[in-house]
């Protein structure tokens, strides 16, 4: 049975370590824990900022091409701040669309989602993309970026869609 790959991408206005981002950073662990306990959750790639990145998920530093344009919109664009200090991607695997929808719009994640404008640059792209993968297949960060770009450029297709 196929599984649903789900990728989110957002750009923080300030770096993770900046006080402005504290409200978001303080919620990360709780939101990840609630995802891992959610019905239909299969697994997730660790962020590039965490030790023990599992290589089967691909290069955790992959980023959508259109993100470079958004870097200029951030307040903290000093040269000593790495671009990935602002990027907040997630990549996960779910049993079905209904499960990830329930996680995204109810509970801890929904609470954080309501405050996203406090922390993130308003995107000019879709904030997430979903696509089906064969059972046993692990989606990669690179594929996720390509799927988000496809959704951005062509709208929903069977290969890249939203809710």
List each language-model region with its residue ranges.
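An exposed acidic His-Trp-rich patch
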Residues: 106-126, 132-133
């Amino acid at each position: 049975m196929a599984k649903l790959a789900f990728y989110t991408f957002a750009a923080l206005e300030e770096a993770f370590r900046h006080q402005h981002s504290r409200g978001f950073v303080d919620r990360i662990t709780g939101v990840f824990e609630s995802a891992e306990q959610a019905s239909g959750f299969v697994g997730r790639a660790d962020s590039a900022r965490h030790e023990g990145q599992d290589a089967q998920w691909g290069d955790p530093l992959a980023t959508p091409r259109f993100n470079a344009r958004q870097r200029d919109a951030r307040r903290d664009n000093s040269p000593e701040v790495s671009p990935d200090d602002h990027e907040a991607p997630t990549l996960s695997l779910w049993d079905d669309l209904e499960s990830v929808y329930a996680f995204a719009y109810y509970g801890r994640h929904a609470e954080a989602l309501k405050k996203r404008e406090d922390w993130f640059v308003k995107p000019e792209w879709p904030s997430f993309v979903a696509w089906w993968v064969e059972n046993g297949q692990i989606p990669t960060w690179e594929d996720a970026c390509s799927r988000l770009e496809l959704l951005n450029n062509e709208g929903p297709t069977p290969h890249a869609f939203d809710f």
